[in-house]
A protein has these predicted regions:
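Canonical tetratricopeptide repeat
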Residues: 37, 71, 105, 139, ...
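Periplasmic peptidoglycan-binding/tethering modules of Gram-negative envelope proteins
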Residues: 22, 26-29, 114, 180-265, ...
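Alpha-helical segment of the N-proximal tetratricopeptide repeat
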Residues: 28-67, 71-83, 90, 108, ...
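Short, surface-exposed beta-strand segments enriched in small/polar/acidic residues
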Residues: 229-239, 251-283, 301-314
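Short coil turns that delineate tetratricopeptide repeat
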Residues: 63, 97, 131, 165, ...
Length: 333
């Protein structure tokens, strides 16, 4: 009888162990999902200190969990502590070497520590795991651009844009790479695309300067109040004082600012080479258009002036002469 009982126990023991292992795996899966959701919550909120406080005890309890180490690295990076982040992200990479995201964030950590060679190696490893990793392609392109390896950077920005055609950093820096490669025609096309998509982005003003330095004044930076506003050039139909659609759109932006700030006044300066009368008509047309669109804006707040000569504009690349142009800027009291 004892032998029978012992045999039954021996037979049941693997089943019991297997059931426990299955239960442990299920618990770990649920815990992992919870950690992922909560970790992303802290990252999305930018509450890195709270994330660190919540995850530090868990890393102490489960030091070999790659995801916990990853989130700790992200919280330390978010708190501008790359030295503290490094051991966590390195451990995450060691525990899960095939995770492209971990490799990418290892690269970001090396970037924060100003170690460009190690940064590049981490991005390249991420791309060896996942060639379509958008962020790794993008940041490796940045690394190459910083090194002056512009042709390689351009290829990587093209790859990033093939993965996300609207990626703003790739769009802008692609134009920078083209400028450095002295491919001005392509640079202009690339920068126009960026400005059409992101006219209010912080880099838009620099983009307009790049176009202007290349002799393209289809966009202008206008100093309005305390801001510099990139706008499409205020243009008219040839030989007339009739605004184009782009010209009207740019004036609406300026009109909105004048409408919102009653103490803001601007100069409207129009140049037409060899035709002072047309320059005058265009200056008055600008003022009249804003008055019609924004009745609260008194005409006196737009001071018109006009010249029958080209506008001369100095840039870092030299002096440019525009036969016809409109310049609008803040009127100093």
């Amino acid at each position: 009888m004892k032998n029978i009982i012992r045999t039954i126990i021996i037979l049941l023991l693997p089943l019991t162990i297997g059931a426990c292992a299955t239960m442990d795996a299920a618990v770990r899966k649920v815990q992992g999902e919870y950690h992922a959701v909560q970790g992303q919550y802290y990252l999305n909120r930018g509450d890195f200190a709270a994330g660190r406080a919540a995850f530090a005890p868990r890393v102490a309890q489960w030091p070999d969990d790659p995801e916990l180490n990853y989130f700790m690295a992200r919280f330390e990076l978010g708190g501008d502590k790359p030295e503290a982040a490094l051991p966590f992200i390195q451990k995450a990479v060691k525990l899960a070497p095939a995770n492209a995201d971990y490799r990418f964030w290892e690269g970001v950590t090396w970037w924060a520590l100003m170690k460009p060679d190690k940064e590049r190696a981490a991005y390249e490893k991420a791309l060896s795991i996942d060639p379509d990793h958008l962020s790794a392609n993008l940041y490796l392109a940045h690394n190459m651009l910083d090194r002056g390896r512009n042709a390689e950077a351009l290829k990587l920005y093209d790859k990033a844009l093939s993965l996300n055609p609207d990626e703003p950093q790739a769009m802008f820096n692609r134009a920078v790479a083209l400028e450095r490669l002295k491919r001005d025609r392509e640079m202009k096309l690339a920068m126009h695309r960026y400005l059409e998509n992101y006219p209010d982005a912080p880099l838009a003003r620099q983009g307009v300067r790049m176009l202007n330095e290349a002799g393209d004044f289809s966009w202008r930076n206008h100093v309005i109040g305390l801001r510099t506003i990139p706008l499409k050039a205020v243009e008219f139909r040839p030989g007339t004082a009739t605004l184009t659609e782009n010209g009207e759109a740019s004036l609406r932006r300026i009109g909105e600012m004048l409408n919102d700030k009653a103490d803001l006044n601007v100069h409207v300066v129009v140049y037409v080479k060899g035709d002072t009368a047309l320059a005058r008509d265009r200056a008055l047309a600008v003022r009249e258009y804003v008055r019609r669109q924004y009745p609260k804006v008194a005409p006196a707040r737009l001071a018109p002036s006009w010249f029958g000569k080209p506008e001369s504009i100095k840039t870092d690349t030299g002096t440019h002469s525009l036969a016809q142009s409109v310049n609008i800027f803040t009127k100093v009291q």
